[in-house]
Amino acid sequence: MMHRGYGGDRRGFRPSFRSDRNSRYAPRTRREPQRYDPMPELAPVEFQKNFYQEAESISRMTPSEVSSFRKTNEMIVKGTNVPHPIQKFEEAGFSSEVVSSLVEKGFSEPTAIQGQGWPMALSGRDMVGIAQTGSGKTLSFILPALVHAKDQQPLRRGDGPIVLVLAPTRELVMQIKKVVDEFCGMFNLRSTAVYGGASSQPQIRALHEGAEVVIATPGRLIDLHDQGHAPLSRVTFLVLDEADRMLDMGFEPQLRKIIPKTNANRQTLMWSATWPREVRGLAESYMNEYIQVVVGNEELKTNSKIKQIVEVCSGREKEDKLIGVLDNFKGDKVIVFCNMKRTCDDLEYVLNRSGYGAAALHGDKSQNIRDKVLDDFRSGRRPILIATEVAGRGLDVNDVKLVINFDFPGSCEDYVHRIGRTARGNTKEGISHTFFTVGDKANARELIRMLREANQTVPSDLEDMVRVSNDRYGSRSTRHGYDYRGRAGRFPYRG
């Protein structure tokens, strides 16, 4: 028996209109993403590297004046024929439009690393820059990179980038791209970012459309290069930003695969906060007669403009102490660093319930949510950012008044970079407040050294921690993988 409106096939009853092409039940064709054929590696083109014309005022500097400038700024240079430092934007040879833009952004003069780094980079030499976080190093390589790219032959169809900047994290990649985009239009150049954790299709499309400047994480760049979407033979200006961090994260094999694929006569710039043996080895392998500038020293050092407060306490006291600290900074931008994603989410709930505008940022967040969180933080809609190590380096937000280490990081190097999110560039002093527990004792001695070197107060409890055994301060559970509320978990975890 056939029922009205139904078909009688062996598959059972179903609406007879199911096959109607206009029916909402009809299968919908899926739109396939546009596919791009691999780009061939084209023959290299001639290029130039030296764009520096020393200003007359710089040429007149006496050796004693040069030495005095470097000594005043705690600067050491190494290598032969290192250019003299500049002290005004105009002396770098940038266009009036670039200089005006720098002034409009609130910069009155180059920072120490820019004053020495710009002449070195613009002269076409391979160079290494060692500088503390917040010193203005991003502009130290971005503006010379744009000058370099602008004065090369135009990109041909299928060419890869002229400038390649490698960075350890997608957050740092996006931050560098933001700085690049502020100046790209003045040079009539295009840039794109290549990083993991997001769809590769828009990145592939941007590479095929052509971009003179590419900022990338090593892993995603290798993937796209191997697929034929990111040829590197046109790269004549290579930057390794936070080289020490990239090696710490295990990117050395990727770096050693990427670098030989660029132009053999390229200019290479390496930037790092420290100068360990591994970074030196990488420089010796791929740089020719490089010159070096060190601002401060090659050892781990904190920014002298940051007032550092270290408070020894137990894990269970942290939450109440955090509220007490935040009460004194209402309305100010504050970054709270934690070691675990779960701690970030817990604190986000606690602080918002208490009336604070807080948002969490960690590795489980999608890129869209991360962008929204950072936009809300920058605008002040949510003035408290709670983050894991994912935001510890490269995050450049204006007017961060306070950095709180709710959890002490796994190393003092990460501590330096965390607190460096405040007092950046030529801005005034910032403050860091760190909660330190017995579980962090392994870092106590190095932390004391850095505090004393920066003329900061060393709490007596911290000194005692170095002298006595762990048993005097806490139970075994406090010293192992438990979070601040005593729950078992992996510690420290950097999301």
Curated annotation (Swiss-Prot):
Binding site for ATP: A131, Q132, T133, G134, S135, G136, K137, T138
GO cellular component: cytoplasm; nucleus
Positions with biased composition (Basic and acidic residues): 1-35
Residue stretches making up the Helicase C-terminal domain: 305-466
Catalysed reaction, written as an equation: ATP + H2O = ADP + phosphate + H(+)
InterPro entries per UniProt: DEAD/DEAH_box_helicase_dom, Helicase_ATP-bd, Helicase_C-like, P-loop_NTPase, RNA-helicase_DEAD-box_CS, RNA_helicase_DEAD_Q_motif
Listed PROSITE patterns: DEAD_ATP_HELICASE, HELICASE_ATP_BIND_1, HELICASE_CTER, Q_MOTIF
Pfam families reported for this sequence: DEAD, Helicase_C
Residue interval(s) of motif Q motif: 87-115
GO terms assigned for molecular function: ATP binding; ATP hydrolysis activity; RNA binding; RNA helicase activity
CDD domains (UniProt xref): DEADc_DDX5_DDX17, SF2_C_DEAD
SMART domains: DEXDc, HELICc
Region (Disordered): 1-38
Gene Ontology biological process terms, A to Z: nuclear-transcribed mRNA catabolic process, nonsense-mediated decay; rRNA processing
EC number: 3.6.4.13
Keywords in alphabetical order: ATP-binding, Cytoplasm, Helicase, Hydrolase, Nonsense-mediated mRNA decay, Nucleotide-binding, Nucleus, Ribosome biogenesis, RNA-binding, rRNA processing
Stretches assigned to the Helicase ATP-binding domain: 118-293
Its biological purpose: ATP-dependent RNA helicase involved nonsense-mediated mRNA decay and ribosome biogenesis through rRNA processing.
Family membership noted in the UniProt record: Belongs to the DEAD box helicase family. DDX5/DBP2 subfamily.
Quaternary structure and partners: Associates with polysomes.
Protein name, as recorded: ATP-dependent RNA helicase DBP2
Species whose genome carries this gene: Encephalitozoon cuniculi (strain GB-M1)
